[in-house]
Design a protein with these regions (language model features):
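A conserved short coil-to-beta-strand element within the FAD-binding core of flavoproteins
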Residues: 115-116
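Conserved N-terminal/central alpha/beta ligand/cofactor-binding core
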Residues: 19-112
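N-terminal Rossmann-like FAD-binding beta1-loop-alpha1 element of flavoenzymes
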Residues: 1-16
C-alpha cells in the first residue's frame, strides 16, 4: 500500500492487485492484533539488529525511514504513540485504524484496488 501511495504521489496511475479477499488483511495480525507500525530507531539500528540481509534493505530504509512513516501517518490523521523498545502503534490500539488510514490515502490518490 505504501509503494502504491508513493507511486501515485509521483503522478503514476496505480492498481493494486490483492490476492486476499480484503486489502491489508495481514495488518490485523501484526503487533498481537494492534498493528506494530514501525520501530522508531535509527536506520543503522535496523540494519544492524533487525534485518538479516542489510544490503538488500539499505536503499529502502534510507529512502523512507521510520520517522517519515510516522510523519506520513500523522499527516493522514492517524495519531501514533511509541512504546517500550521504540515500537510504534496507533493511539487507539486498533489495527483497523491503520488500515482505514491507508485505504483513505489510496482513495485520495485514485489508486485502483482489485481484490481476489
Amino acid at each position: 500500500m505504501m509503494a502504491a501511495i508513493a507511486a501515485a504521489d509521483c503522478g503514476h496511475q496505480v492498481t493494486i492487485i490483492e490476492k486476499n479477499e480484503k486489502l491489508g488483511k495481514k495488518l490485523f495480525i501484526t503487533g498481537k492484533g494492534r498493528c506494530n507500525i514501525t520501530n522508531d530507531s535509527d536506520v543503522e539500528n535496523h540494519l544492524n539488529h533487525v534485518i538479516s540481509n542489510p544490503k538488500f534493505m539499505y536503499s529502502a530504509f534510507y529512502s523512507f525511514d521510520s520517522s517519515r512513516m510516522i510523519d506520513f501517518l500523522e499527516q493522514e490523521g492517524l495519531a501514533v504513540k511509541t512504546e517500550r523498545g521504540n515500537r510504534v502503534f496507533q493511539q487507539s490500539d486498533k489495527s483497523s485504524d491503520v488500515l482505514q488510514t491507508l485505504q483513505k490515502a489510496l482513495r485520495r490518490r485514485n489508486v485502483t484496488v482489485r481484490l481476489h
